[in-house]
Amino acid sequence: MAGLRARRGPAPGLLALSALGFCLMLQVSAKRLPKTPPCPPSCSCTRDTAFCVDSKAVPRNLPSEVISLTLVNAAFSEIHDGAFSHLPLLQFLLLNSNKFTLIGDNAFTGLSHLQYLFIENNDIWTLSKFTFRGLKSLTHLSLANNNLQTLPRDIFRPLDILNDLDLRGNSLNCDCKVKWLVEWLAHTNTTVAPIYCASPPRFQEHKVQDLPLREFDCITTDFVLYQTLSFPAVSAEPFLYSSDLYLALAQPGVSACTILKWDYVERQLRDYDRIPAPSAVHCKPMVVDSQLYVVVAQLFGGSYIYHWDPNTTRFTKLQDIDPQRVRKPNDLEAFRIDGDWYFAVADSSKAGATSLYRWHQNGFYSHQALHPWHRDTDLEFVDGEGKPRLIVSNSSQAPVIYQWSRTQKQFVAQGEVTQVPDAQAVKHFRAGRDSYLCLSRYIGDSKILRWEGTRFSEVQALPSRGSLALQPFLVGGRRYLALGSDFSFTQIYQWDEGRQKFVRFQELAVQAPRAFCYMPAGDAQLLLAPSFKGQTLVYRHVVVDLSA
């Protein structure tokens, strides 16, 4: 019996003690064996570090306590917004010998504890402006041995406590895009190792820190399309009346002289009024003794003078211009000599004569007949050195210069511009102490002549086949020349003071311009281009800082 009882096994109490002891052994073993942290196959990890080689993307499955990450020879080329935001405790980040070509805006967002960032030996040409946004704790930054050619302006602005910066081993192009860096290096408290220019040739191997700011010519200008007036026009004349800015446009296509008003709030030209004019070629506004008059010159149906009545707020016809004197007007010039107001009309009729009219008390009266029988096309009034002159041109003979005689109170023929016998139009400008004439030609090159007393010397020839309009104008100290054509786009030239000639500056898509008009409107500097075949375009002159 005793043997049978022995085969029944250990007592229940002994089994319970054995089970308890086994559990305690398991707990002790669990405490002795460290838990393996998560780690991607391309990385080697400890509890707070990760070293990754040949990764195909920024590793995601990393210990949350990681404070140091190294990426070497990564198989991806771009780092995008928030790429490391899953590692908020990161303090050290090394991106070395990778194939990175792009690091985008906010690439390191969420790394508010990052102190050391090394992006070295990659193939990055440039960085985004906000690449380093959010790195408020960064003290050491290395961008050494990349292929950086430029850096966005103020890229280091978010790095408030940056102590050390390394930019060595890059291919910096020291043009206007780097000017801001030269300025920043001169004032920053950050320690920056010497860096050198790779280009352009004149700065090659020069230390960036030593570049003189005066060597950077970074301010340029541009004419940008500002407003489109959806109608053709053949002349444009801005004028001020009662402290407001207006524009008079001759529009034979709609049988009117259209008056536009500048809206200083909307900063646009708005419709204001119209004067009936079935065949208008020029609408010339004149403000005489605070009264507004508009001379309406027409090819057919006679020419007239209108007066603005502020009481009825409308234009009323003041007088007719004798059709026997003015048959086919082509251009108008208004000017003041010794306190008296005049306007001259260029007559393109074979039987007509260019005529001068003078204001007297209540109207304009015929004052002088000039240059009869020559089919004149253009007038230019020049008031220089106290000697008022009027230049009359047409396409069949040399332009004629008339000088005002204060004794006779008339224009007297002074000479001709024989260098250009077929000028379609003549304009003038002054540069320094010298006076110049610009003469446009429909066939052949337009000419720039220096005016030297009674002599003229050619300065420049400008290709201009099909040109019926040119205009020199001055904007903020910069001198330009607009040269139009019926066969090609308008060319804008800029005056080169050193070379004393115009250089090609910009091309404007204007079809068949008939005039160019510079109009300052508050802080907007505008160039108007009335077109005979298309829309009338308004361009704005803007100043561009290439270092921005």
UniProtKB/Swiss-Prot annotation:
Superkingdom to which the source organism belongs:
Eukaryota
**Known partners and oligomeric status:** Interacts with STX1A.
Q: Does the keyword Secreted apply?
A: yes
Q: Which organism is it from?
A: Macaca fascicularis (Crab-eating macaque)
Q: Where in the cell is it found?
A: Secreted; Cytoplasmic vesicle, Secretory vesicle, Synaptic vesicle; Synapse, Synaptosome
Task: Report domain LRRNT positions.
Answer: 31-64
The stretch of residues making up the signal peptide is: 1-30
**Pfam families membership:** EPTP (PF03736), LRR_8 (PF13855)
Q: Where are the LRR repeats?
A: 89-110, 113-134, 137-158
- Where in the sequence does glycosylation occur per the annotation? 189, 311, 394
LRRCT domain segment(s): 170-220
- Which ranges does the UniProt record give for the EAR repeats? 222-264, 268-310, 314-361, 363-406, 410-453, 455-497, 501-543
Is Signal included in the keywords of this UniProt record? yes
Q: Name one GO biological process term.
A: regulation of exocytosis
Which InterPro entries does the record associate with it? Cys-rich_flank_reg_C, EAR, EPTP, Leu-rich_rpt, Leu-rich_rpt_typical-subtyp, LGI_related, LRR_dom_sf, Quinoprot_gluc/sorb_DH_b-prop
Q: What is its main location?
A: secreted
Write out the function statement from the record. Answer: May participate in the regulation of neuronal exocytosis.
One GO cellular-component annotation of the UniProt record comes to: extracellular region
Q: What is this protein called?
A: Leucine-rich repeat LGI family member 3
